[in-house]
């Protein structure tokens, strides 16, 4: 299986749109762009992405880690966390979801591509 379908969970609209544009230019299909943890859970179940790019600090009652935990209850979908800042306690909470990676904002598209390539390569090797 190769990563083709990506769900973006990002509450900063400009970052979400930039990510969507860059991923599309790289040949990926962005199946959805949502801004909250609750929307992420619904979209993950309905859209069945190959991977979720999840902001850790989301507006609202649920952060990205809590949303990832809920998504992973139903089925395994790889998560790559996006964050501008993460403390040790937050990183430990995130690690419990076995993420495929962390991207610190601002990040270069090559860093995102490296994670996506690694993920695809590991799946192809299985």
Report residues per predicted region:
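Non-catalytic signal-transmission and effector/linker regions of two-component phosphorelay proteins
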Residues: 1-5, 110-126
